[in-house]
Amino acid sequence: MIHPSYVELMKVVNNNVEIGEEPVVNSRYSIVIAAAKRARQIIDGAEPLIAHPKCNKPLSIAVEELYTGAVRIVSDDEDLNEGEEA
């Protein structure tokens, strides 16, 4: 059994969404893509954002970061808005 499960990750990621707002993550595919992108950053030399990861594998670290809230998934719309403010 994989821990945390996709369902658990989706609940954590969508935890701060207000009632009536669009959830950040609608599918398992979104979680997989986010974890893969973060794992690629770690492989390319980015430091883990958690102090003591349970595993040394980049994908496991990325999943743990998502689960603990150390990494946030940003929608394309949010990313564009942040770029305009800068």
From Swiss-Prot:
E.C. number(s) listed in UniProt: 2.7.7.6
Catalytic activity entry: RNA(n) + a ribonucleoside 5'-triphosphate = RNA(n+1) + diphosphate
GO biological process assignments: DNA-templated transcription
Any Pfam family: RNA_pol_Rpb6
InterPro entries documented for this protein: DNA-dir_RNA_pol_omega, Pol_omega/Rpo6/RPB6, RPB6/omega-like_sf
GO cellular component: DNA-directed RNA polymerase complex
Alphabetical keyword list: DNA-directed RNA polymerase, Nucleotidyltransferase, Transcription, Transferase
Gene Ontology molecular function: DNA binding; DNA-directed RNA polymerase activity
Function: Promotes RNA polymerase assembly. Latches the N- and C-terminal regions of the beta' subunit thereby facilitating its interaction with the beta and alpha subunits.
Assembly with partners or alone: The RNAP catalytic core consists of 2 alpha, 1 beta, 1 beta' and 1 omega subunit. When a sigma factor is associated with the core the holoenzyme is formed, which can initiate transcription.
Family note: Belongs to the RNA polymerase subunit omega family.
Name of the protein: DNA-directed RNA polymerase subunit omega
